[in-house]
């Protein structure tokens, strides 16, 4: 929902007061200095001219030196604030980024994973991180804008005595400038989504080239020229967007120059005419000329910063829209106790990511009884992982429903339900923390014995690693460098910890052993089925021999369940399962 400019300003000031109130103090001082410095520059020349024309005296000289001393003090204070302001902004950014990260971790997984969610997050992240746009940009505009308003009021009070027409011209031209800035801002707003999409593509490519796997592939497959060409293409698109934005700013600058020239011409003609008519003295002329220049600068600052504030408000809306994003309504019923067992039913479940997309799953009907061992097999893209994510509550069915012990999953508290699930996905990552924390997270220090048992269970005890060893060498010089198979064993130890020593009642292994050979995978699955005795299990695999001992095997094909049954039943069908099984078996003969 789009918030007004004033609403966004109040929101940012309240949040900034919470995270780094020294910024608010700095803004108040900057506002004061922003008024006093230009006004002092108006009165000082007039005072000097008046002193000379009227004869020097001690009072006049003292007044001049007092103003000069005052200017020295406030300029020194301004320089100090400028040096410290960057530190204050950094503290403020950390507060807003913390809000953003917390929100991302709580939002629906399906939204975060979608292109829409990724673009919204990228926009919000950059609006917080950038020094010149978003939050920091809005804060940098507030003080000169308020200073301009105060300065305009003071200068109008002086200039009214000269000619009311001059004041009217200043105000009228300011409204023209505001209108032009509004039109240009509307055009710049249209560029926001293309810029965010471009940034996401560029960040992905840069991340790929700097990552370990990308670095290997670029060298092995001689991808340097091709990758560079793609990056240059994305950069070229970004430059074109920047040129378009700069073009809009150029038109605004041209409008500034024309309005400023017209405004000052009218004011100077009025002042000179007043001198010719003998209405003002020379020192007053100097003061009025200074006031005209000062007022014109204040008006330009006001209209320019008001336009910038409008642009910054658009960026703040991006942040607030992400932070205000609501999840799908979550049920309040508690799931069954882990000792009760889980019976999960999928009734005519279909799923697609967006309305305009093709269905990934179509009319899936499946029952997983308590304590049953289920295997899901099929080729890549058959819908296996999507089906698992629906069972986990990460996705909601587009059509149909999921029942847990005969209760609609939409009526169950999803966080409580997910505590009953121990999962290992094929794309799980390690955290830049210790080995123990990667297995037990916050319980690492209080569960040392249990962690060691899980490490032994997965075979990691052979590595002689310490529990407090960091597992990311890129972030810690003393860190470990686990191989692909070792990384998967750490993930499996994490699953074993939740399954054996915490609340898990359902084990889901979604091809987490892809870095292992077929024999090692078979042994691991058998061991996990043993420790999951009395619990429901779902195993997802390409390799048929790893899952042929399960109670039920379903074969996915193009988003549908093509076949189901035990291993022997499926072999007798002489269908898709048998063809895949015999083909894979031939590889090991």
For every predicted segment, state its role:
Residues 526, 534, 539, 543, ...:
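C-terminal portion of ABC ATPase nucleotide-binding domains
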Residues 24-77, 155-188, 262-269, 273-282, ...:
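Transmembrane helix-loop-helix hairpins at lipid-water interfaces of multipass membrane proteins
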Residues 1-37, 60-62, 81, 85, ...:
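Membrane-integrated ABC transporters
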Residues 1-10, 90-136, 198-241, 313-324:
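Extended non-transmembrane interhelical loops and adjacent amphipathic helices
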Residues 121, 460-490, 494-512, 587-588:
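ABC-fold ATPase nucleotide-binding domain signature/coupling loops
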Residues 223, 267, 288-324:
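Cytosolic ends of transmembrane helices, especially the final helix of ABC transmembrane type-1 domains
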């Amino acid at each position: 929902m789009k918030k007004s400019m004033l609403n966004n300003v109040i929101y940012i000031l309240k949040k900034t007061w919470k995270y780094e109130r020294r910024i608010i103090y700095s803004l108040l001082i900057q506002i004061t200095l922003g008024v006093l410095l230009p006004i002092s520059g108006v009165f000082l020349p007039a005072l000097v001219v008046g002193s000379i024309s009227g004869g020097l005296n001690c009072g006049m000289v003292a007044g001049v030196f007092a103003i000069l001393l005052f200017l020295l003090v406030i300029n020194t204070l301004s320089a100090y604030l400028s040096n410290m302001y960057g530190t204050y902004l950094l503290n403020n950014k950390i507060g807003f980024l913390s809000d953003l990260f917390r929100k991302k971790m709580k939002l629906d997984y399906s939204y975060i994973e979608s292109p829409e969610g990724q673009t919204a997050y990228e926009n919000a992240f950059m609006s917080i991180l950038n020094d010149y746009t978003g939050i920091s940009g809005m804060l940098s505009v507030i003080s000169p804008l308020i200073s301009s308003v105060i300065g305009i009021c003071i200068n109008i009070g002086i200039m009214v005595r000269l000619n009311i027409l001059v004041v009217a011209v200043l105000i009228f031209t300011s409204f023209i400038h505001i209108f032009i800035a509004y039109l240009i801002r509307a055009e710049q707003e249209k560029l926001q989504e293309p810029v965010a999409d471009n940034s996401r593509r560029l960040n992905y490519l840069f991340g790929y080239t700097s990552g370990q796997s990308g670095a290997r592939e670029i060298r092995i497959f001689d991808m340097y020229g091709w990758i560079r060409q793609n990056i240059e293409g994305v950069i070229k698109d970004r430059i074109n967007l920047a040129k378009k934005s700069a073009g809009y700013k150029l038109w605004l600058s041209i409008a500034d120059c024309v309005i400023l020239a017209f405004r000052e011409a009218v004011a100077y003609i009025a002042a000179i005419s007043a001198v010719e008519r003998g209405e003002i003295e020379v020192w007053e002329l100097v003061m009025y000329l200074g006031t005209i220049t000062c007022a014109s600068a204040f008006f330009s600052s006001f209209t320019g910063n008001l336009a910038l504030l409008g642009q910054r408000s658009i960026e703040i809306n991006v942040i607030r829209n992400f932070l205000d994003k609501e999840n799908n309504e979550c049920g309040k019923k508690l799931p069954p106790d882990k000792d009760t067992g889980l019976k999960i039913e999928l009734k005519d479940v279909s799923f697609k990511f967006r309305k305009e997309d093709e269905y990934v799953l179509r009319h899936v009907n499946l029952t997983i009884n308590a304590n049953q061992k289920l295997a899901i097999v099929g080729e890549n893209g058959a819908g296996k992982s999507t089906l698992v994510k629906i069972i986990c509550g990460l996705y909601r069915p587009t059509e149909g429903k999921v029942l847990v012990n005969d209760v609609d999953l939409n009526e169950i508290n999803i966080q409580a339900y997910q505590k009953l699930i121990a999962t290992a996905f094929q794309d799980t990552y390690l955290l830049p923390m210790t080995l123990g924390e990667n297995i037990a997270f916050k319980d690492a220090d209080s569960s040392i014995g249990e962690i060691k048992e899980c490490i032994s269970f997965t075979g990691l005890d052979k590595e002689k690693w310490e529990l407090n060893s960091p597992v990311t060498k890129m972030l810690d010089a003393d860190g470990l460098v686990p191989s692909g198979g070792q990384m998967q064993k750490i993930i499996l130890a994490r699953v074993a910890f939740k399954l054996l020593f915490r609340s898990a009642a359902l084990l889901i292994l979604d091809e987490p052993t892809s870095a292992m050979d077929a024999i090692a995978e078979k042994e691991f699955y058998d061991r996990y089925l043993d420790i999951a005795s009395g619990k429901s299990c779902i195993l997802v695999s390409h390799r048929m021999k790893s899952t042929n001992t399960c109670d039920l095997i379903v074969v996915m094909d193009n988003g549908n369940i093509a076949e189901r049954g035990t291993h022997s039943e499926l072999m007798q069908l002489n269908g898709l399962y048998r063809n895949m099984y015999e083909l894979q078996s031939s590889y090991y003969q």
